[in-house]
Amino acid sequence: MELRAKEIKKKASEAARNEVLHQTLSSAGDRFVGLREAGFSQLNDPDGLRIRGRQVKERSFANLPRLLRLLEKKVTDAGGVVHWAEDASEARSIILDLAGRYGVKSVVKGKSMMTEEIGLNRAFSRKGIEVWETDLGEFIVQLADEIPSHIIAPAIHKNKEEVARLFSEKLGVPYTVNPEELTMVARRTLREKFLGADMGITGGNMAVAETGTLVLFENEGNIRMATSLPRVHVALIGIEKVVESWDDFGVLLTLLSRSAAGQKMPTYLSLITGPSKPGEHDGPEAFHLVLLDNGRSRIIGDEVFRDSLFCLRCNLKQPP
């Protein structure tokens, strides 16, 4: 679904009158705040951690050209391929060209705000390529033909009754409001999509330049499936996601996990360095990393707006 500017006023008016939506968002917001406070309460110096997180990003931005060149070299050394995209159009073209080269008919995706930024799903649909969101919230939003409403909880605006009706209508399953049963419906449906997919597409929480490693955080396991079952893995990240070292990674891991969900670390932490190697029995045959600028290099040099690129996509809405 593409939300046009003229529709926003109407949508906002409808949402303002929706009491169920108000209750759903209020409950979810309280839950996020509680988890975050509990997570940071376990640290001796949470403010110091935030300062170190900002220092990591400052160093990365100050050395960005060098780090990006190093990242490209290390990814290439590991058997991967790096592509440079100046804007959204070029990123779409690169990924669609890869899909054509590998004869891709079906794609599974991990949750990625970057693919939303470039409008990738619509581009696939126009080419007749089947694409499935595999994050539970994104899957719900896709079935409803909506856009994500939250950076880490895409379907935060829907309650279990709405999801139950949606699954019954779109997937032809019996109506149930039991969360475990609804989750199993999604799991069974998506398992078939994983097994039949030719390409997996993800974003990335970080890229560690010194080893050429893509870092992915998640709590559901769908991203790991999307990166290990299809024969081709394409990762799309903004150039601001690169950090130099594993020490830098450790600082941001601690900060992001606690801020997003009050966790010491995510349930699944995937560290991907190139495609599968000879003798390995899982993982993709090919790994492609698409580095997207799309105005980021200009923003990094802007004293007013550069803070927007310090964002870790952690739900706090306040960059370190």
Annotate each PLM feature.
Residues 1-305:
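The feature marks the mature, well-folded catalytic cores of soluble enzymes
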Residues 304-320:
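Cysteine-centered iron-sulfur cluster-binding motifs in ferredoxin-type domains/subunits
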